[in-house]
Regions:
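Oxyanion-binding and handling regions
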Residues: 1-24, 34-36, 91-200
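Phosphate/pyrophosphate-binding loops at sites that engage ATP/ADP/AMP, CoA/4′-phosphopantetheine
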Residues: 43-59
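DPxDG-like acidic metal-binding loop motif
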Residues: 59-95
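Hydrophobic packing within well-folded, soluble alpha/beta domains
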Residues: 15, 39, 57-60, 82
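Phosphate-handling active-site elements
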Residues: 50-55, 84-93, 109-111
């Protein structure tokens, strides 16, 4: 089983391959908001470096948001195009569940719930998961970090400084497939309106 994972929801882009044993190969582009121009260059570099091609990929995964409006659309469009050309199964994961997965790796013996929190310009995004990474709430956006409805309590764990990339999304899909957990179809997750829509 090998997974091609795509993450373009931040200012940079990353594409990763996760193999059957959980080994990760990742390529990044740190140039700000350069998703469209760099996507297939990153993908070709990844394939060339690690002797991969579409025939060696079994599953596709894309981070569907929340994050950059343009980045979300670029990642989803690219993933759907690859899915159409290769007929490989395609799954959507959100950045909060990817963060929850990385937190779970830091606290492997904990049975506490996991509160994923991602900061943004307006406040933060958040979602609650149990220790098996099953969602206990939907993803939400909050404008005030001190909001009581999203307070962090002692019965859950969190970590706000996870440095996420596409390999974490691929590893999450690897985990869910291995544990026979539900994987979602691709649907864009916009928790904030894009700036140009606010002026309409």
């Amino acid at each position: 089983m090998s997974i091609l994972a795509i993450d373009t929801v931040g200012t940079g882009s990353s594409i990763a391959i996760v193999d059957y044993d959980g080994n990760c190969f990742v390529e990044r582009n740190s140039a700000s908001n350069n998703h469209v121009e760099s996507f297939f260059q990153i993908l070709n570099t990844l394939f060339d470096k690690h002797n991969y091609n579409y025939d060696k990929i079994d599953h596709l995964a894309v981070v569907v948001g929340p994050g950059s409006f343009t980045g979300i659309r670029v990642g989803i469009s690219a993933a759907q195009g690859i899915n159409l050309a290769t007929n490989k199964p395609l799954y959507g994961v959100n950045a909060l569940e990817v963060q929850a997965y990385t937190i779970s790796l830091l606290c492997t013996n904990s049975k506490k719930n996991i509160r994923a929190i991602i900061k943004n310009a307006q406040g933060f995004y958040t979602q609650l998961f149990d220790f098996n990474l099953l969602p206990l709430s939907g993803p939400t956006a909050a404008r005030e970090p001190g909001s009581k409805c999203h307070a962090i309590s002692s019965d859950c764990i969190t970590h706000m400084d996870c440095n996420l990339n596409a390999s974490h999304a691929g590893l999450l899909v690897h985990y869910r497939l291995k544990n026979k957990q539900k994987l979602n179809e691709v649907e864009a997750l916009y928790l904030n309106e894009p700036q140009y829509m606010k002026s309409l």
